[in-house]
Structure formats: structure tokens, C-alpha cells
Amino acid sequence: MAIGLKQLKDYCGRKPGSHAGSPFGEGNLVFKVCGRIFASLHVKESPVKITLKTDPELAGLLRQTYPAVRPARYFDKRYWSAVTCDGGLPEDELLELIDTSYDLVVRGLKKSDRASLRELDPR
């Protein structure tokens, strides 16, 4: 079963410090943490596509395994992948990719920004 737009918005929006906006026009909904993009939803496409930051090795493996995962347009193709949300990638793996994207972006933030995020979500 394919994950829907509402589920994707809700999941990305629940990440600590997550803010949504449309800096590229109303066809894209971008989720940022501390001003850095971790997910870009292509909301006018059907099925919906989401662009996520990925580890380069994992990206290569995912692209070989799942036709729904491709290099992202307009982003560095080594680090960013576009996922077509048509059920071609299992939902649990897609949610894990969102988590990974968020974590990779947070890892690249300044120490003070990471500390403020830990206050929001002290896990």
C-alpha cells in the first residue's frame, strides 16, 4: 500500500524543530530543521514524490533494488534521492529514509543548534 501525502506531511512535521514551507512554489512542500532541508514533497505530482538526503552507499543500493528510488533532480545526486510513493518502496523503509535524512541533516548542524534540538526531543 502506498503512503499518502497527509501521512508524509504528518511524519515530517513531527520531527523536532521541523518547519514546513514552499520556497520553490506551491508544487513543493519543503521541510527544514534549523534552516536546512531534510525533505521536499512534490505535492502536485501523482503519485507523490519525496526527495530525501541519503548516505551515498545506501542510495546506490536502494536505486539498484527499488525502481521507485532515483537520483533527485535539482539536488546533489550523490546525496539526495527522489522516492516515488507508489508502494514500490515498503512504507517502513520510506519512513526509515525520512528518519535517516533528518538525522544526516541534524548531524551537519552547528553544535549549538543540535543542543537546542535535544531540548525539544530529549530521547
Tell me the role of every PLM-derived stretch:
Residues 1-123:
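Charge-dense, helix-prone N-terminal extensions
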